[in-house]
Amino acid sequence: LIGGTLLLSTLTANGQKKNTQPNILFILCDDMGYGDLGCYGQPFIRTPHIDTMANEGMRFTQAYAGSPVSAPSRASFMTGQHSGHCEVRGNKEYWKNVPIVLYGQNQEYSIVGQHPYDSDHVILPEIMKDNGYTTGMFGKWAGGYEGSRSTPDKRGIDEYYGYICQFQAHLYYPNFLNRYSKALGDTGVVRVVMDENIKYPMYGPDYQKRPQYSADMIHQKALEWLDQQDDQQPFFGILTYTL
């Protein structure tokens, strides 16, 4: 995992001061190595926008992921704990209690998520929320399974759109995504079925006919959330991409 932080202006267009706390956008990417960006010396793939951000800001040369795999690495980021102390130790899958584990039979799916974060320990979005921030997260959660004690709606997130389950996040044309939106009146995390995708099977040659590409949909939801933010209140956003 690699992360970047973007601090935005604290002045309005007419020069009047708004909130004094910086807006923060933190980006996490699965499977992006230290040497995959131009600003860290990668010579073959062009990353001009990220390189510009690095040139205008700061590069971290001794920042390390908490673990080589997804869920425990994210847990270290969220909890601030060393992976040796964190309760999440691997990408353990939790499934619904059904006789046969199914995924991909159109609307029959049983994936629900990973081991939940310990509710006795505060996590980063909760800290930001307690300090007056509006919070949003878009992409992979992997910090609890559906219905567990640790889903975005219970852990300081105001707006969420993406994958609760880290395994499902590697299926780019899924049967469903997860959503939590106070603005839409959600009282908990819900499933949003991809109506166009489920017309085609999850496996085989017809899979390529599925039109709803999750990365684009998640990215668009994040942009919409950013556009909706109030100048008078700081925001903290987490974007988690699966490359």
Segments and roles (model prediction):
Residues 1-19:
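Bacterial Sec-dependent N-terminal signal peptides
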Residues 17-58, 141:
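Active-site-proximal N-terminal segment of extracellular/periplasmic enzymes that hydrolyze or transfer
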Residues 31-34, 59, 66-71, 83-84, ...:
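Solvent-exposed loop/turn segments at secondary-structure junctions
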Residues 38-39, 88-90:
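Conserved catalytic-core motifs of eukaryotic protein kinase domains, centered on the activation segment
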Residues 39-40, 64, 113-114:
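A generic secondary-structure micro-motif detector
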Residues 43-75, 80-85, 132-136, 155-164:
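Short, structured active-site-proximal loop/turn typified by the sulfatase FGly-forming signature C/S-X-P-X-R
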Residues 90-133, 141-237, 241-243:
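Formylglycine-dependent
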